[in-house]
Amino acid sequence: MASYTTTDFKPGLKFMQDGEPCVIIENEFVKPGKGQAFTRTRIRKLISGKVLDVNFKSGTSVEAADVMDLNLNYSYKDEAFWYFMHPETFEQYSADAKAVGEAEKWLLDQAECIVTLWNGSPISVTPPNFVELEVVDTDPGLKGDTAGTGGKPATLSTGAVVRVPLFIQIGEVIKVDTRSGEYVSRVK
């Protein structure tokens, strides 16, 4: 099995920690004035979803995680599972609510998602970075009401709620950044 040393660490690297695949969110090399250098990392366990801060002594090796990222198209959802299909082989994968997590509110039919597989089953789903959704409910923007933050909540077609500018009306299609859940622009 492949392994990585602390010099290979970078955000997005997947490795095994305590028998569970993990991904590095951020890392920093630290050389204190006294003592041995180390790498300070923030990792997310891919199965449990826990975020941990872990320090590794410089030169420490970790085992590479045997995970695979696939670009799959979202097909449909039933009572318990979300189904994704490989665009070339038409092979279907089913992911449970734990694997889909927060991505549920950004999933559109035929949206290309990154599905992470471990031992052949999906453990996480990453939606596209940007999605275009219709506003189904929002308060009317009052003319001249610009004293506040200049935003209002809007419910989108998938059920997600985001803050939008006052000029956005019901029925308009907007572009949303799924990583931060923020409004980006109006779609013409």
Curated annotation (Swiss-Prot):
May be beta-lysylated on the epsilon-amino group of Lys-34 by the combined action of EpmA and EpmB, and then hydroxylated on the C5 position of the same residue by EpmC (if this protein is present). Lysylation is critical for the stimulatory effect of EF-P on peptide-bond formation. The lysylation moiety may extend toward the peptidyltransferase center and stabilize the terminal 3-CCA end of the tRNA. Hydroxylation of the C5 position on Lys-34 may allow additional potential stabilizing hydrogen-bond interactions with the P-tRNA. GO terms for cellular component: cytoplasm. Pathway: Protein biosynthesis; polypeptide chain elongation. It comes from the Bacteria. Transmembrane segments: none annotated. The modification N6-(3,6-diaminohexanoyl)-5-hydroxylysine is found at residue 34. It is found in: Cytoplasm. Pfam families: EFP, EFP_N, Elong-fact-P_C. One of its GO terms (molecular function) is translation elongation factor activity. InterPro entries: Elong-fact-P_C, NA-bd_OB-fold, Rib_uL2_dom2, Transl_elong_fac_P/YeiP, Transl_elong_KOW-like, Transl_elong_P/YeiP_cen, Transl_elong_P/YeiP_CS, Transl_elongation_fac_P. GO terms for biological process: peptide biosynthetic process. The keyword Cytoplasm applies. Involved in peptide bond synthesis. Alleviates ribosome stalling that occurs when 3 or more consecutive Pro residues or the sequence PPG is present in a protein, possibly by augmenting the peptidyl transferase activity of the ribosome. Modification of Lys-34 is required for alleviation. This is Elongation factor P. It comes from Actinobacillus succinogenes (strain ATCC 55618 / DSM 22257 / CCUG 43843 / 130Z).
